[in-house]
């Protein structure tokens, strides 16, 4: 079976080879999900359910059902605030775009498409491109677009650097190529970003009162929390990205070959040590502590995943 190359996996490969090795070659992952990832996934789930036809009320109810009981490892107040944040962001998003004129051609489109050598047209015998497109929509002018949802913890205003970076974002290019390979003649990407709130729970304030205050703030400053714009992809940009994909696949194959000759395969994958990389890495304590990973006996707090792409397996089970 060919290994899957997703946008998230390729980003990990570019960010730190050791992190990529542990996460995608060994399948190591934290047992407990970090708050930003958990909130983003639940928010995304609510949008998906609504796009698939569920009412706003049921979409919010379903997206927040995992917050019904606070786990032992979290603070009950923090847990309740997170739930209120999720409810308010979903309600605000539904309100903000209730008058949009998007026709959904597909919702949560999971894909596996060939990785092709751009110079020869040969198909990779080792890897396939995989992922999940949030949606394919028809715009009011009749064009097809890939719809991509994101949550962000930074400025998303019209002049923010956030939008400048998207001009070179590989995930967008991958999704355009995948959608076209699956028969959707997409012309652009509609990028929908929701900013996470910066207001915090006040002293003596209940989580419910915080949620009401957040929803009021969203109503008064919708553009602060929600932005949506087109991100085009030109044909020459897609051609360059195809070359980048093939180059990264060759790099990964070279790493695998070298690892096969070493007593500690992790040594073939050098570390990218720095504040920006280590500060956001789930393996930082293990890596900086010089811990050697045995996948048959993972460190406390970690597990070895049976599938390194659980987000894709989840979709396949629902299909």
Where in the sequence are the language-model features?
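RecB-family 4Fe-4S metal-dependent nuclease core
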Residues: 1-319
């Amino acid at each position: 079976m060919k290994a899957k190359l997703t946008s998230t996996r390729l980003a990990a490969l570019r960010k730190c080879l050791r992190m990529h090795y542990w996460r995608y070659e060994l399948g190591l992952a934290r047992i407990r999900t970090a708050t930003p990832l958990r909130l983003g996934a639940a928010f995304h789930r609510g949008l998906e359910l609504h796009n698939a036809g569920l009412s706003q009320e049921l979409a919010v109810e379903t997206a927040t059902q995992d917050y019904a009981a606070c786990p032992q490892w979290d603070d009950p107040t923090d847990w309740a605030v997170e739930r209120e944040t999720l409810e308010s962001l979903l309600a605000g998003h539904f309100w903000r775009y209730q008058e949009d004129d998007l026709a959904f051609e597909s919702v949560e489109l999971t894909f596996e498409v060939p990785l092709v050598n751009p110079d020869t047209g040969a198909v990779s015998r080792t890897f396939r491109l995989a992922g999940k497109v949030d949606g394919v929509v028809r715009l009011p002018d009749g064009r097809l677009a890939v719809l991509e949802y994101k949550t962000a913890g930074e400025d998303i205003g019209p002049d923010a650097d956030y939008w400048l970076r998207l001009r070179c974002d590989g995930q967008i290019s991958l999704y355009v190529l995948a959608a076209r390979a699956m028969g959707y003649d997409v012309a652009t990407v509609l990028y929908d970003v929701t900013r996470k709130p910066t207001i915090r729970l006040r002293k003596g304030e209940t989580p419910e009162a915080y949620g009401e205050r957040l929803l009021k703030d969203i109503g008064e400053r919708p553009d602060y929390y929600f932005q949506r714009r087109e991100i085009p992809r030109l044909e020459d940009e897609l051609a360059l990205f195809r070359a980048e994909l093939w180059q990264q696949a060759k790099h990964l194959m070279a790493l695998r070959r070298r690892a096969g000759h070493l007593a500690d395969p992790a040594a073939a994958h050098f570390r990218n040590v720095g504040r920006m990389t280590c500060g956001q890495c789930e393996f930082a304590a293990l890596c900086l502590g010089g811990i050697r990973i045995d996948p048959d006996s993972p460190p406390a707090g970690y597990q070895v995943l049976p599938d390194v792409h659980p987000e894709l397996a989840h979709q396949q089970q629902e299909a």
